[in-house]
Amino acid sequence: WGDGNPEGVRQRAAEEMKNTARAARRFFNAAPPEIKQQLTRIVVNGFTGSSIWQYLYAFPPTPPDLIERGFQDFATRWKPILDVFEQEDVYFALEVHPTEIAFDIVTAERAIEAVNGHPRFGFNYDPSHLGYQGVDYVAFIRRFRDRIFHMHVKDVWWSSVPRLSGVFGGHLNFGDSRRYWDFRSPGRGCINFEEIIRALNEIGYRGPLSVEWEDNGMDREHGAREACQFVRQLDFEPSRLSFEAAFER
């Protein structure tokens, strides 16, 4: 695999991803029937990496063809991986995240285009990586309604007034009071989870509401209990009847 050689390591990582799809299929096949019935699809969450992650901030000016080559490189490496996911009837969900090939709505659309709309490529929806950037995180759900394969209930706080550091964090550790934004226990940040649940119900999402918890200012065990209670209170089934239909005899 050319250990120590970057390209050899990339090839080994690609094979690892293919084997992950195969393993996910085998885990599903071995699961009890009651577990299988709860799953709408088999999903592997993860990151794709990006050969252009260092150009997140477009200065010095970044030539458009350099960015295009980055998306082409992503497609060249990931289409064969996604083909194995298709063979195994498994879906790959990229967590849209700064320094990944997709980090907002525009780059998520471009990533889909790069792999020619591959049916096994979609997203692990995590609003905490979108809100503080200024991205419309509820619109993301509706925009990619057929590609939301998984989601994280993860909250983030961002300031309503200027701070000593900005979106890029000022090289400050998480939990530092000088930050412009920071992760919070679900329900204690700025994310509007009410609108998220309504949008997920609207698109027919039936997957898990998976808590990813980070909060430097809170005890973890307290946070785990609180997050569980928050999600149970938050979630609800969509209406099966329109408002107008309720008046029909």
Name each model feature, range by range.
Residues 1-123, 221:
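Active-site acidic/histidine proton-transfer and metal-coordination neighborhood
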Residues 12-23, 133-142, 193-196:
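Short, acidic/polar
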Residues 49, 156, 213-214:
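Flexible loop residues that form catalytic
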Residues 68-190, 239, 243, 247:
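Acidic/histidine-rich catalytic cores of soluble enzymes
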Residues 188-202:
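A short, acidic, amphipathic alpha-helical segment used as a generic capping/interface helix at domain edges
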Residues 210-219:
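A short, acidic, flexible beta-alpha connecting loop/helix-capping segment that sits on the rim
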Residues 220-240, 247:
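C-terminal helical cap(s) of enzyme catalytic domains, especially alpha/beta-barrels
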